[in-house]
Design a protein with these regions (language model features):
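Helix-start (N-cap) detector for alpha-helical repeat units in TPR-like alpha-solenoids
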Residues: 1-2, 45-48, 87-89, 121-123, ...
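Canonical tetratricopeptide repeat
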Residues: 6, 53, 93, 126, ...
Length: 237
């Protein structure tokens, strides 16, 4: 049992260190198989840690494969937590898993718990996105302002600006929305999402010529951009 446990753990850590997705998948499969077998005969005191590691393994499987494992990640992380296992990253992993399952309220609850334990810019953007999904834009904006003002992670700042642009567009605050999207494009001229956002802005203003133009720009940069494809298909009818 000890050999299975350690082999499972080492396979997990090898998986998350890989840059090759197919190699990562293989190591994760090995990790899950070993840990599930180890659970059958594990000492009671070791069960919560195995559940925690198994939950994390399923979480990472959910990110590197086309199949969904977020429900299994939640199952084992919840069991580990209920059985008294202490790890500061459990609430964040649970929040991300709830988000993957389309359960924003549960996700917000877990992210809020995570913030009390360990604050990070990635956590702030995650909770802002979930607040946006449930229509609580005032709460979302507070987190996004903080990221814009304080974060040194340029990619997260651009993500925050994009979400602010979408919120401003929804609020019909078109000048501020346009400013966000244009600032993104000044920093990254290849942002398909920013062109898509500008297209939605022009759509709301009733300028469909400009809207289509922006969506086409988005597709030039990202041929499978779901939002731009959907909009152009909608207006092609």
């Amino acid at each position: 049992n000890t050999a299975l446990t350690y082999h499972g753990y080492s396979s997990f850590y090898l998986a998350v260190s890989q840059t090759d997705t197919s190699l990562s998948q293989g190591y994760l499969d090995e990790a899950v198989n070993c840990m599930r077998l180890a659970l059958f005969s594990a000492k009671k005191s070791l069960v919560p840690q195995l559940q925690y590691m198994l939950g994390k393994a399923y979480f990472y499987k959910n990110t590197v494969t086309s199949f969904y494992y977020a429900d299994l990640a939640l199952k084992y992380l919840s069991l580990a937590k209920a059985n008294g296992y202490k790890a500061n990253d459990i609430p964040e992993y649970m929040g991300l898993s709830y988000a993957a399952l389309g359960k924003p309220m549960e996700s917000i609850s877990s992210f809020t718990e995570a913030l009390l334990l360990r604050e990070s810019d990635s956590l702030l953007i995650s909770i802002a996105e979930q607040y946006y999904k449930v229509g609580q834009t005032s709460a979302a904006k507070q987190y996004l302002y903080r990221i814009k003002k304080e974060s040194s992670d340029e990619l997260l700042v651009l993500r925050a600006m994009g979400l602010l642009g979408a919120i401003y567009t929804d609020e019909k605050n078109f000048s501020d929305a346009k400013a966000e999207f244009e600032e993104i494009l000044r920093k990254n001229k290849n942002s398909a999402d920013a062109y898509y956002g500008l297209g939605v802005l022009y759509e709301k203003q009733g300028d469909m010529v400009k809207a289509r133009s922006e969506w086409r720009k988005a597709l030039k940069l990202q041929v499978n951009h779901s939002g731009a494809l959907s909009k152009l298909s909608e207006y092609a009818k």
